[in-house]
Amino acid sequence: GEPQLLAGIVGDVAGAYAVDAHRVYAAGLSAGAAMAVVLGATYPDVFAAIGVHSGLEYQAATDVTSGLTASASGGPDPTQQGDAAYAAMGAYARVVPVVVFQGTADTTVAPANGAQVAAQWVETDTKAGATLAAAASTPGTGGGKSYTLTTYADAATGEPLVEEYLVSGLAHAWSGGSTAGTFTDPSAPDASAIMWSFFAAHPR
């Protein structure tokens, strides 16, 4: 399927160029964010960490109907989906760091999905061996919009393993994106910079 094709493209590029195999990441918006979740669960041996912007938890959308339902009001129980994602990892199971962005004004992907994605990965990473501290929430601002950052950190090291940015007033658009693009909001925190900083701290 598509995840296999994308993992294969990574292999082709790595075979042609000097790619650090320990620093390959996947991030996306909307359906692309849902695909990043799938890649993190099915190819944890390829992707070191993932970024999920306005997406859905693992297997929240298995057909058109479930996709529309999840987008409108949230997906299935995150614990259940987290266990399914862990099972999908198979012999390659490991802790996958995840950074999530979601807007409170998103009418395409309901805001509840952001917290569900984070909760799903907390469950998946816990099953993979992580011991996470209780969630810690801190307020912030960026680009003119405020946000709440919820962090789930390694209990021993304090290293953030799952982060969720809930951006106030952000619609279905890439947070901090260019004015030249579509589905972007330059008056919001710079998701690209934040994701890259998170990725840089989490090689495989």
Question: Residues of each region from the PLM?
Answer:
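Gly/Ser-rich "nucleophile elbow"/oxyanion-hole loop immediately N-terminal to the catalytic nucleophile
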Residues: 1-34, 41-47, 93
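Soluble non-cytosolic domains of exported or imported proteins
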Residues: 1-4, 30, 41, 108-112, ...
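Non-transmembrane alpha-helical segments in soluble domains
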Residues: 7-10, 115-122, 196, 200
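Short beta-strand immediately N-terminal to the catalytic nucleophile in serine-hydrolase-like folds
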Residues: 26-28, 53, 101
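A conserved short beta-strand
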Residues: 46-57
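The feature captures the conserved acid-bearing segment of alpha/beta-hydrolase catalytic domains
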Residues: 58-159, 166-172
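Active-site rim elements
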Residues: 104-109, 175-187
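Catalytic active-site module of serine/aspartate enzymes centered on a nucleophile-bearing elbow/loop
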Residues: 184-204
